Amino acid sequence: MRSRKLTGAVRSSARLKARSCSAARLASAQEVAGSTSAKTACLTSSSHKATDTRTSKKFKCDKGHLVKSELQKLVPKNDSASLPKVTPETPCENEFAEGSALLPGSEAGVSVQQGAASLPLGGCRVVSDSRLAKTRDGLSVPKHSAGSGAEESNSSSTVQKQNEPGLQTEDVQKPPLQMDNSVFLDDDSNQPMPVSRFFGNVELMQDLPPASSSCPSMSRREFRKMHFRAKDDDDDDDDDAEM
């Protein structure tokens, strides 16, 4: 009987231990599930906040673009054309400089410069149109320059025509080259070369008298005798000077 009681007590204690272990496992599993649910809730809330902020920023940007487009539609085209535009200043200045050069007188140039200072940068086309209209009315000087160029061309043509007869007379006065059939031109001939072609008239040279020698011709012996005599005379003079 005692052995049965002992075995029953051991079994009951083992059952209690198994129940307590299962309860502890269930509690730990519930705790893990609660922590994961809290984490997922935090993540979902943060993602919702991020999406809300992004959508709000996009909504604000869209609102700004819509407001700008509405303002541009409300502003008339004339007002938009009158607004100052950022354009390079160099073409305008070049056009005003050309206009002042075309207009006669200093007053026209001063008026054009004043107009350039008063008008905005976008009014370059108006000034260029007015300048073209003034040139059509006859205030510019390109026509005169074209006329002067035509006059200069006419004068140069007349001068050339006047010079042409003089050139023709000079050509007529020059005698043409005459090729004679002389012996000098014949390469195969054995006759002597004509001297008159190089030295002029040879007959005048033959009439001249022969060149006279300055000193008479003497032999070598006579020259030696004279040399020694002169040498002896020099020695005698030296002796007399020493005495």
UniProtKB/Swiss-Prot annotation:
User: Which gene holds the coding sequence for this protein?
Assistant: C1orf174
**Which domain of life does the protein's organism represent?**
Eukaryota
Reply yes or no: does the keyword rRNA-binding apply: no
Q: Which residue windows does the record flag with biased composition (Low complexity)?
A: 145-157
Name of protein: UPF0688 protein C1orf174
Which PANTHER family does UniProt cross-reference here?
UPF0688 PROTEIN C1ORF174
Q: Where is this region: Disordered?
A: 78-100, 132-243
- Give the sites modified to Phosphoserine: S148, S189
The record's family statement is: Belongs to the UPF0688 family.
Keyword Membrane on entry? no
Q: What keywords were assigned to this record?
A: Nucleus, Phosphoprotein
Q: Where in the cell is it found?
A: Nucleus
Cellular component per GO, a single term: nucleoplasm
InterPro entries the record matches: UPF0688 (IPR031530)
The source organism is: Homo sapiens
Q: From start to end residue, where is composition biased (Acidic residues)?
A: 233-243
Write out the coiled-coil annotation as residue ranges. Answer: none
